[in-house]
Amino acid sequence: WIYYLKADLFLIDPAVRPLSPATGISISIASLVIGWLVYDVLCKSPLEQNQILLSIIGFTFVILMAYFYQNMFSPRGAFIHTGALMATIMSANVFLVIIPNQTKVIASLKAGNAPDPRLGAIGKTRSTHNNYLTLPVLFLMISNHYPMTYSSPYAYILVGFVLIAGAMIRVFFNFRHAGKGDH
């Protein structure tokens, strides 16, 4: 909320784009909602059958949004908004997809019916996305304490490296926790 309450200080940089606080806040909120909707549509499209392609398109989408934010807000505001976009996607996955699907599965089982396996598959996809976004979101949220992370004109490219590094770290921990890695 501090980015909205003090938008002229934290969110907006007239050297990047001369926006009023109200305009900056509106763009911020709209981009988070639209970002979720774009992601949700991608996940419900035929791409859901090709997880690798869906991941590549999702990765590209986040980089494009980071570039958009970098050309719209202050450098600090851009990085925090890229993290906020991914955190919004993660939260919406839980509250709008994973929990409702689980509720339907439980209701089916309680009624003595076989649950729709597609609901579980959808939940697993969204949960997997959340798993791989967790570390990049944490990095982007704490990066505001380290100006060297967001002050470059190529900061949006750093977002890509953070996404890749976060995914690689999660793969390592996923294998290790599954007992498939060295202990």
Language-model segment annotations:
Residues 1-183:
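Polytopic transmembrane helical bundles with strong interfacial aromatic enrichment
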